[in-house]
């Protein structure tokens, strides 16, 4: 059965989603989870784009050994040099070069003739191949390119040393029939095509990214590029979990397989959703909250008699536990440590102690601690390594239907002093945020506020996501707590601390903070 390589670009193309700005610890945590998922290649970022991206790509390349790590580069020498410096310590250093090949891109964006584009592509591939054993070359906007020209430039870059050829549907324009024909055309018209692997990369502007990816595989693609939860620029990218499960469930049709560990899919999806702040829709295939829910009485009756009547995917296949209660207030440290290690924890003893303390605090308030609860507590610790300049000490809110909502907060300041302030608002959250703004003594513009429960039930943990403009920088923050108001305050301060850390990072490395 033909093996399909899975190329995950969550940390590069996925991070280009509007409002997503992952910090160093968050990128590392996602990369380690992608390794546990079994992806073949992790596109860790664009090393030449910023010092922050360079450092995170370098760290991921040095840490991750179970998956190959790659970075994006334009067809210019300085980008290739930056990629090499970031990736040379990787287990299998590889680079991802690109240049546009469609008439509209060549004329209006590149302002180059087709001949100049071929020359530039060949020059960059030769230079990259002198350092990297694996050179992937992408024809940006391939689906809107002239096929004879595309075949010509592909042959040229193969001769120059490319080992993987990627044909992206950059703007989500093509259809399954068209993309299959494109791959078949290249297989038939590029003399050296059998010397390389073919890759597909599809965007979801017309809602066909997954369908196009599967059609490309039928047309001869050996590698599929995708993101967790389908996140990405504009309408997003092809969804890794949907492609992976489709290839698994329909092996009879596609006659291919991947090396993914499917039971890690739900955990990976939840992690990416939490760290990016991009909520997974309830009706999302494979990982949505309703993916295995049956409302119709006829459907429920059928599932009770035989699950296969209406469930082609079992929850267990993708890591959705049917019995999610795992620990309680009387659980000991050994059982706790075993469970968090099962969930993928690889942190320090100090982090483990902090998670155990948070677990015990939660267990006093919540009778049943689920895997989702534990995973949320674990994530808070493993990606919370940034300096907290402002720390919430106490929070008290007075609320009543006929009263003025008032919040009183004590907070530890960067100086080490503890300050107290109070303010009112039309609602409890507004009162909290008005109080925090007074303590910060700086204007804050709240751009987005979202809340969701991590598990069901009235005692569920709350997860709050905010996006704000603070000191001219747009940052996001997250907060998790048993109480939604406490989670709201934590999310606010998390965003503030992230802004300060980003500015300090920029001062050290001389890189511009994007506004």
UniProtKB/Swiss-Prot annotation:
Pathway: Amino-acid biosynthesis; L-leucine biosynthesis; L-leucine from 3-methyl-2-oxobutanoate: step 1/4. It catalyses: 3-methyl-2-oxobutanoate + acetyl-CoA + H2O = (2S)-2-isopropylmalate + CoA + H(+). PROSITE patterns: AIPM_HOMOCIT_SYNTH_1, AIPM_HOMOCIT_SYNTH_2, PYR_CT. It is an enzyme of class 2 (transferase). Gene3D superfamilies: 1.10.238.260, 3.30.160.270, Aldolase class I (3.20.20.70). It is found in: Cytoplasm. PANTHER family: 2-ISOPROPYLMALATE SYNTHASE 1, CHLOROPLASTIC-RELATED, HOMOCITRATE SYNTHASE-RELATED. Belongs to the alpha-IPM synthase/homocitrate synthase family. LeuA type 1 subfamily. Catalyzes the condensation of the acetyl group of acetyl-CoA with 3-methyl-2-oxobutanoate (2-ketoisovalerate) to form 3-carboxy-3-hydroxy-4-methylpentanoate (2-isopropylmalate). This is 2-isopropylmalate synthase. The gene is leuA.
């Amino acid at each position: 059965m033909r093996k399909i390589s899975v190329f995950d670009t969550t940390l590069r193309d996925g991070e280009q989603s509007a409002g997503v700005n992952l910090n160093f610890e968050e990128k590392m945590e996602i990369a380690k989870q992608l390794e546990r998922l079994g992806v073949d290649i992790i596109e860790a970022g664009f090393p030449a784009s910023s010092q922050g991206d360079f450092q995170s790509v370098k760290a991921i390349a040095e840490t991750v050994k179970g998956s190959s790590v790659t970075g994006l580069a334009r067809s210019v020498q300085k980008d290739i040099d930056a990629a090499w410096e970031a990736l040379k310590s990787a287990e299998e250093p590889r680079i991802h070069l690109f240049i546009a090949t469609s008439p509209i891109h060549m004329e209006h964006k590149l302002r180059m003739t087709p001949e100049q584009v071929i020359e530039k592509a060949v020059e960059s591939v030769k230079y990259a191949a002198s350092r990297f054993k694996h050179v992937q070359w992408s024809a940006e906007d391939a689906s809107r390119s002239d096929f004879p020209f595309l075949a010509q430039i592909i042959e040229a870059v193969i001769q120059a040393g490319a080992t993987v050829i990627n044909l992206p549907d950059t703007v989500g324009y093509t259809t399954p029939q068209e993309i299959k024909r494109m791959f078949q055309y290249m297989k038939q018209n590029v003399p050296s095509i059998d010397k390389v692997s073919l890759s597909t990369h599809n965007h979801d502007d017309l809602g066909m990214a997954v369908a196009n990816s599967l059609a490309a595989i039928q047309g001869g693609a050996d590698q599929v590029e995708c993101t967790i939860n389908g996140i990405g620029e504009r309408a997003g990218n092809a969804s890794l979990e949907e492609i992976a499960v489709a290839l698994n469930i329909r092996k009879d049709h596609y006659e291919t397989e991947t090396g993914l560990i499917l039971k890690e899919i739900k955990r990976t999806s939840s992690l990416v959703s939490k760290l990016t702040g991009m909520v997974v829709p309830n009706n999302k295939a494979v990982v949505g909250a309703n993916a295995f829910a049956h409302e119709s009485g006829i459907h429920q009756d059928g599932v009770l008699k035989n699950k296969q009547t209406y469930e082609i995917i079992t929850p267990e296949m993708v890591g959705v536990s049917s019995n999610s209660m795992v620990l309680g207030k009387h659980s000991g440290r050994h059982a706790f440590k075993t469970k968090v290690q099962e969930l993928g924890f690889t942190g320090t003893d100090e982090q483990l102690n902090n998670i155990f303390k948070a677990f015990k605090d939660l267990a006093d308030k919540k009778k049943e601690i689920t895997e989702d609860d534990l995973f949320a507590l674990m994530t808070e610790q493993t990606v919370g390594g940034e300096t907290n300049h402002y720390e919430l000490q106490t929070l008290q809110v007075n609320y009543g239907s006929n009263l003025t909502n008032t919040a009183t907060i004590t907070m530890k300041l960067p100086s080490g002093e503890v300050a107290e302030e109070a303010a009112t608002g039309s609602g409890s959250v507004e009162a909290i945020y008005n109080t925090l703004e007074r303590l910060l003594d700086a204007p804050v513009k709240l751009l987005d506020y979202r809340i969701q429960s991590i598990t069901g039930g009235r005692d569920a943990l709350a997860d709050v996501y905010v996006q704000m403009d603070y000191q001219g920088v747009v940052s996001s923050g997250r907060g998790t707590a048993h109480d939604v108001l406490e989670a709201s305050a934590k999310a606010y301060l998390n965003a503030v601390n992230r802004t300060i850390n980003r500015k300090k990072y920029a001062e050290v490395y001389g890189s511009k903070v994007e506004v």
